[in-house]
Amino acid sequence: MRERRAGGQWYRLLPMRGRKRRRDRTGKSRHRLKVAPEQELAVRPAAVNERTEFGHWEVDLVIGARQEGVLLVAVERVSRLVRLVFLRNKEADGVAAAVERLLSGEVVQTLTYDRGLEWMRHERIAKALGAVSYFCLPYHPWEKGAVEQMNGLIRRYLLKAESFAWEEADHYWLELIEANLNTRPRRVLG
């Protein structure tokens, strides 16, 4: 650039002709899940928002350090019942299969997700569980506050710097964490 300001012409031979690179901001939408308007959180039934019916779940992932392992967290909105399962990665097919296994014995009316690409198979999950899927607005994780609160409680047991690349024998700890969270006294439950 100094050569250009001094009146020289050598900058024209450079690949970018001396221009600074700009970050592509239009590519951000490709990293989020596009959902239909009828699946927005704003159209979710009032009974879900008021927490009067059992069977409405919020689902999220907690990612281990260096992307090594993922913890699938499902929280029922009324009872605050928690279900946890360990996954090796957050590929959409594996996540969908895990949600189906995790909630197959539960009453499931609705599922609430964020807009991550790991939920691309939400239709498959909804069909298998006989539920309806709803999605938060982009970058609005507080719209599924029950599961976000639970993620914070889980981080008291599993630190952010901790990898989730566990052996099968270590799943005992996951069951222990789930039991502790489910038996935890809560003011909201009376």
Language-model segments: which ranges?
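Short loop/turn microsegments at loop-to-beta-strand junctions
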Residues: V70-L71
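Two-metal-ion RNase H-like nuclease active-site motif
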Residues: F54-G64
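Acidic/histidine-rich, metal-coordinating catalytic segments
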Residues: E106-R121, Y139
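Mobile genetic element proteins and their domesticated derivatives, centered on retroelements
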Residues: D60, A74, R80, V99, ...
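Active-site beta-loop-alpha junctions of metal-dependent nucleic acid enzymes
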Residues: I63-Q67, L84-E106, T110
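A short acidic, amphipathic alpha-helical/loop segment
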Residues: A98, E123-I125
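Basic, flexible linker segments flanking DNA-binding modules
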Residues: M1-N49
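Charged alpha-helix within mobile-element recombinases
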Residues: V107, A126-G190
